[in-house]
Swiss-Prot record:
Protein known as: Potassium voltage-gated channel subfamily E member 2
Gene: KCNE2
Effect of Q9E: Risk factor for drug-induced arrhythmia; impedes activation and increases sensitivity to macrolide antibiotics; may lower current in KCNQ1/KCNE2 channel
Organism: Homo sapiens (Human)
Biological function: Ancillary protein that functions as a regulatory subunit of the voltage-gated potassium (Kv) channel complex composed of pore-forming and potassium-conducting alpha subunits and of regulatory beta subunits. KCNE2 beta subunit modulates the gating kinetics and enhances stability of the channel complex. Alters the gating of the delayed rectifier Kv channel containing KCNB1 alpha subunit. Associates with KCNH2/HERG alpha subunit Kv channel to form the rapidly activating component of the delayed rectifying potassium current (IKr) in heart.
InterPro entries named in the record: K_chnl_KCNE, K_chnl_volt-dep_bsu_KCNE2
């Protein structure tokens, strides 16, 4: 267990050194005002904030990837032999076949609105 805690501590130190070096090299050319502001920021120690953000973004990415993978896997499990799927496929096919076959039987019908019989249309 001590090797795991040492590994964790070592990993944290490595990340911290990398980010401190990056951030220090990033702000080489500064003015006096920027240096004064940087002294205030250095006093607040934001190094752990970057590590925290990396962990949170990593966890969020892991959750999103897990949701996408589970969705893809569930879509693959949907087979065409599924009874519900077959019912829908056959139902739509039969509906369209019956509509095509019954085209000769369809007749034009006129519906009259009896309530509107009192209104006269202008010529």
């Amino acid at each position: 267990m001590s090797t795991l805690s040492n590994f964790t501590q070592t990993l944290e130190d490595v990340f911290r050194r990398i980010f401190i070096t990056y951030m220090d090299n990033w702000r080489q050319n500064t003015t006096a005002e920027q240096e004064a502001l940087q002294a205030k920021v250095d006093a607040e120690n934001f190094y752990y904030v970057i590590l925290y953000l990396m962990v949170m973004i990593g966890m969020f990415s892991f959750i999103i990837v897990a949701i996408l993978v589970s969705t893809v896997k569930s879509k693959r499990r949907e087979h065409s032999n599924d009874p519900y799927h077959q019912y829908i496929v056959e139902d739509w096919q039969e509906k369209y076949k019956s509509q095509i076959l019954n085209l000769e039987e369809s007749k034009a019908t006129i519906h009259e609105n009896i309530g509107a019989a009192g209104f006269k249309m202008s010529p």
